[in-house]
């Protein structure tokens, strides 16, 4: 009976008494007060920089370093306008933050923007990487593994605009760390270019794969999209041409100066034929020059183990499939040239005549491509 009475009280309409105000609900909030400032705990106030008084001491550098770390999170903002403005901000600050510890955080957060959905963000990222390379190319070289990973992601991306813009990033990277890129991902990058351009690879290997065309997984819609965008196709052709010249003919072949000014009369100032003869006997310019031998790694390709358990050292890459080529190290120019001539040269040669016949920017680039292929054949392996 008591519970029934309590329930009825909830539905009873209270009677208003004369001279008394209306009773307020129990959960009412008093809004009669005034505040002079509002606290936003989810946002951080960022200063305009360490100019003037604090720029000359360690406190200014520390503040600038913390400011960069706070701004880096905006590169993952849901708004493409915010991401673009953040990239523009970092581009204007590169000269001051290029040697700060927070530069590593910036690179790790900005490189994934190669696959960003916004065209404007990707364009500004290319300008940012170019600015970083102009100030200190070693920053890009230290991040070559991450750069290679996201370059391949962009080349194989399901969204056609992201795939088309991959050549833009390749050209920027080749300007400052061409040698590192070709040594690290020679075969993967070549396969990626074939996928971006919609070409097929005709294998020239063993009897099982002889005369077999391997599609690179390009859909008809992406090929039509690339054909409609002649400008992007030309940019990817240029990127592929520069990449092949850097890998087969040397870093100096792409038209950029050597990164070491003390070697002006060294390897990069002579012809590629002389370069390949004596460069292997010079002191290497990069760390771990013999890592391609895999002396301290246990990695064997399928079917390359003998009965004694030792790995066969066959240098004939023509008998290897495209899947087995992934395990082949391409640290030296000789191996890269051999792999290119046996697996990629015939497929490229089949595509160039049609491009030259079409004319235009793509035709001129294809003509330069054809001249480069003839130059590669003239080099005695």
Swiss-Prot record:
Keywords assigned: Nucleus, Ribosome biogenesis, rRNA processing
Keyword set includes Phosphoprotein: no
Record-level GO cellular component terms: nucleus; rixosome complex
rRNA processing found in the keyword field: yes
Pfam families: Ipi1_N
Signal peptide annotation: none
Comp. bias (Basic residues): 14-23
Domain of life from the UniProt record: Eukaryota
Gene Ontology annotations of biological process type: rRNA processing
Start and end residues of each stretch annotated as Disordered: 1-32
Compartments where located: Nucleus
Protein family membership: Belongs to the IPI1/TEX10 family.
Description of how the protein assembles with itself and partners: Component of the RIX1 complex, composed of IPI1, RIX1/IPI2 and IPI3 in a 1:2:2 stoichiometry. The complex interacts (via RIX1) with MDN1 (via its hexameric AAA ATPase ring) and the pre-60S ribosome particles.
Biological role: Component of the RIX1 complex required for processing of ITS2 sequences from 35S pre-rRNA.
Protein's name according to its UniProt entry: Pre-rRNA-processing protein IPI1
């Amino acid at each position: 009976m008591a519970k029934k009475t309590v329930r009825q009280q909830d539905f009873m309409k209270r009677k208003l008494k004369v001279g008394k105000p209306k009773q307020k609900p129990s959960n009412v909030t008093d809004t009669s007060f005034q505040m002079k400032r509002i606290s936003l705990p989810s946002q951080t106030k960022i200063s305009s920089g360490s100019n003037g008084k604090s720029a000359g001491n360690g406190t200014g550098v520390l503040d600038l370093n913390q400011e960069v770390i706070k701004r880096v999170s905006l590169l993952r903002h849901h708004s493409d306008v915010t991401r673009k403005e953040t990239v523009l901000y970092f581009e204007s600050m590169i000269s001051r933050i290029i040697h700060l510890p927070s530069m590593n955080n910036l690179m790790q957060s900005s490189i994934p923007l190669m696959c960003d959905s916004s065209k404007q963000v990707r364009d500004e990222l290319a300008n940012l990487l170019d600015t970083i390379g102009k100030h200190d190319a070693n920053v890009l070289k230290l991040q070559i593994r991450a750069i290679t990973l996201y370059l391949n992601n962009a080349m194989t991306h399901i969204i056609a605009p992201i795939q088309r813009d991959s050549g833009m990033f390749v050209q920027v990277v080749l300007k400052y760390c061409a040698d590192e890129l070709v040594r690290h991902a020679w075969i993967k990058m070549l396969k990626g270019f074939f996928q971006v351009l919609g070409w097929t690879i005709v294998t020239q290997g063993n009897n099982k794969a002889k005369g077999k065309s391997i599609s690179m997984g390009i859909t008809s819609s992406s090929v039509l999209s690339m054909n409609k965008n002649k400008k992007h196709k030309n940019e990817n052709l240029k990127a592929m041409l520069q990449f092949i010249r850097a890998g087969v003919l040397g870093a100096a072949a792409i038209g950029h100066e050597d990164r070491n000014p003390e070697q002006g009369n060294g390897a990069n100032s002579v012809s590629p034929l002389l370069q390949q003869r004596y460069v292997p006997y010079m002191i290497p310019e990069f760390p771990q020059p013999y890592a391609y031998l895999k002396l301290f790694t246990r990695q064997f390709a399928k079917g390359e183990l003998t009965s004694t358990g030792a790995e066969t050292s066959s240098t004939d890459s023509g008998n290897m499939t495209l899947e087995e080529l992934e395990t082949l190290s391409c640290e030296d120019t000789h191996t890269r040239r051999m792999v290119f001539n046996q697996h990629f040269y015939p497929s490229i040669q089949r595509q160039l005549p049609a491009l030259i016949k079409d004319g235009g920017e793509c035709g001129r680039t294809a003509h330069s491509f054809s001249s480069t292929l003839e130059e590669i054949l003239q080099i005695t392996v």
